[in-house]
Amino acid sequence: MIGLYKVFDAHVHFYSNAYFKFLVKQKPNRADISTELRNLAAKGHIEIPGEDPVQLAKRWVDIIDKWKLERLLLFGSMPGDEESVVKAVQTFPHRFAGLFTVDPNSNVLMENAEKRLKTDKLKGILLYPSLYQIGVNDEWLYPLYNLVQDCKGLVFVHFGKLILRPRDYAGIPTVTNDQFGNPKDLIPVAKKFAGIRFIIPNFGAGKFDEMLEVGKSCTNVYVDTAGSNSWMAEHPSKPDLRQVFQKTLQVFGSGRILFGSDSGMLPRGYRYDIVDNQLKLAQEMRIPTADIKKIFYENTASLVDGI
């Protein structure tokens, strides 16, 4: 608890050892795995964790205990690394819940998703339409949405500008197709699959106005506040974070906004400056205490715990 407020961070990447190994294996003309991992760590000034995800999970518990946070929603940030998040969540079920990234083009898409949602009890999926170059409204994804809906799961969908630092550090180009990066594509999907709670991270990551349109049209779409929101400097209206919060509150209300930090890299660990700045801003804006509690804890807890 930070002051009066409990914190359930809805956006934390669980960058495991397996994640980094999966990543460097994608690099063309690569050296051996150990060399690539050393090079990646040196370029990014980051730490590659040890092979045991449970030890990494314990480290994250220590980190959030230090900063007096209650819970984290952990992202398995690459297809194939679901098991790391599963082990973290199973070891610390009262501190962590988990999501996993899907590759819509995988021939084991449905088989794996069913296992992770039904057997492993992960809480939902992460979609990157522009990275995997498939529209969020493509009918190919409808069976996946039906499965998530049956499991009362969540769907995080990243739109707008995609920044993938680990790929940069590994020397792997991030090739995206911006035609799949518009949040408005989510409107027909959210209406068709009304039982799914969709979350657009990073206030739309530069597609802020489009994100607001989705919020007006679909009451089952949420937004998270994650990260530094560097997209604001490139947005035509150059909003500051106060204006972003004000407009988002007008459309989504306090009940559909989730605090997130976009933490993940070690040794930096938790981005406490993000939660500190956003909590201070909420108080300076005189957002009612009850609404601040929703944004920073209760909304995410309700989605994850099925309250």
Role assignments for model-derived ranges:
Residues 11, 64, 85, 125, ...:
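Conserved, mostly hydrophobic/aromatic
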Residues 123-124, 137-258:
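Catalytic pocket-lining loop regions of alpha/beta-barrel enzymes
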Residues 15-17, 79-81, 105-108, 161-165, ...:
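Active-site environment of divalent metal-dependent phosphoester hydrolases
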Residues 70-71, 78-168, 173-177:
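Active-site gating/metal-coordination segments in enzymes
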Residues 7-10, 74-75, 99, 126, ...:
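Active-site neighborhood of phospho(di)ester-bond hydrolases with catalytic His/Asp-centered motifs
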Residues 1-66, 71, 247, 252-256, ...:
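Mid-to-C-terminal alpha-helical segments outside catalytic/metal-binding sites
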Residues 32, 36-52, 157-179, 264:
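Glycine-rich phosphate-binding "P-loop"
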Residues 57-61, 82-89, 113-114, 141, ...:
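Generic structural signal for well-ordered alpha-helices
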